[in-house]
Amino acid sequence: MHTLEMLLLVLLLVPLAPGEGDGQAVGGDRNPSEARRAYKRLLQRPARRMDRGGCTPCGPNLCCSEEFRCGTSTHHQTYGEPACLSY
């Protein structure tokens, strides 16, 4: 058999990859209400205690490491809030 024929034979014998057509949601296939529940569950987790060793306090819940400086965010969603800036 030629190489091309062997390759086609192998491709015909290989089953579908897992996740393809087996009914399981992957990535973008997730139900929006399921994603919302997961996000709310994430928000309800207790906050971790901040380790302020070796950093500069830059707001009530923000601590900048030594290579960054305190400033205000220019991002459209967090404009004017405290932020760690690299310049």
UniProtKB/Swiss-Prot annotation:
Keyword field contains Disulfide bond: yes
| Tissue specificity note | Expressed by the venom duct.
What disulfide bonds does the UniProt entry report for this chain?
55-64, 58-70, 63-84
One Gene Ontology cellular component: extracellular region
Signal peptide, first to last residue: 1-19
Keywords of the record, alphabetical order, are: Disulfide bond, Knottin, Secreted, Signal, Toxin
Give the Gene Ontology MF terms in alphabetical order: toxin activity
Q: What are the subcellular locations of this protein?
A: Secreted
Its chief place of residence is secreted
Write out the propeptide range(s). 20-52
Q: What is known of its domains?
A: The presence of a 'disulfide through disulfide knot' structurally defines this protein as a knottin.
Q: Please give the family membership noted in the entry.
A: Belongs to the conotoxin Q superfamily.
The molecule here is called: Conotoxin Ca6.2
Q: Which organism is it from?
A: Conus caracteristicus (Characteristic cone)
